[in-house]
Design a protein with these regions (language model features):
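Conserved active-site beta-strand-loop modules that form the wall/rim of enzyme catalytic pockets
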Residues: 29, 79, 109-112
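Short, well-ordered alpha-helical segments in soluble proteins
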Residues: 42-53, 82-86, 94, 109, ...
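Glycine-rich phosphate-binding P-loop
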Residues: 64-84, 114
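Conserved P-loop NTPase mechanochemical-coupling segment
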Residues: 79-90, 179
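Glycine-rich, phosphate-binding/catalytic loops in enzymes
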Residues: 14-16, 84, 127-131
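Canonical P-loop GTPase G-domain recognition
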Residues: 5-69, 87
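Helix-rich effector regions associated with P-loop NTPase G domains
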Residues: 8, 23, 91-183
Length: 183
């Protein structure tokens, strides 16, 4: 969901993981659903594994790749884009994928679609609010008004002009007033 992210912060995370030798593939599955870049990145890995198998006298195998993340992160949407058709259910809420399911992408790759994974107990209030803000946890877990206030405070802290410009708000001192102006 790179289309929803801050480019500066995203680039810092990309650098962080690339510095640790991870393969990073930022992708926008909504506005640019071209997933060829993903196959371009994983093909050398698959070839390397199968070359080792062949050198040991074994047959090459289809790569089996685990797709995991927090609920509502776009795992099933990614798989559907890679397959090129709707093969898994998707929804803009957590808990749509309920079981593990192997999806054959092509003759070289199978992906394991998984339900979202979270910590068993969310003790950190900020973590819980961040997850609720991105609809990774069910609405019933936290109060919607508390989440809205948290989101507005976060936007005012990180991007103060965005909320003012988007909703034509002049006074950003009172959160309840801002909620009223937006609503």
């Amino acid at each position: 969901k790179i289309d929803l992210c801050d480019n500066v912060k995203t680039n810092k995370w990309i650098k962080y993981y690339e510095d640790r030798d991870y393969i990073v593939v930022p992708i926008d599955l909504i506005n640019n659903p071209n997933t060829k870049i993903i196959f371009d990145k994983i093909k050398p890995l698959i070839d390397e594994i199968n070359d080792k198998r062949i050198s040991k006298g074994l047959k090459p195998r289809r790569a089996r790749i685990l797709v995991m993340g927090v609920p509502n992160a776009g795992k099933s949407t990614l798989i559907n884009r890679l397959v090129g058709k709707k093969s898994t259910n998707v929804g803009n809420r957590p808990g749509v994928t309920k079981t593990l399911e192997w999806i054959r992408i092509n003759d070289k790759v199978e992906l394991l679609d998984t339900p979202g994974i979270l910590w068993p107990k969310l003790d950190d209030e900020e973590v819980a609010h961040n997850l609720a803000s991105m609809t990774a946890i069910k609405e019933e877990v936290l109060d919607c008004e508390d989440i809205a206030i948290y989101i507005i405070n976060k936007i005012l802290s990180d991007y103060p002009d965005n909320i003012k410009d988007r909703y034509n708000i002049t006074n950003t001192g009172d959160i309840v007033d801002i909620l009223d102006q937006i609503g």
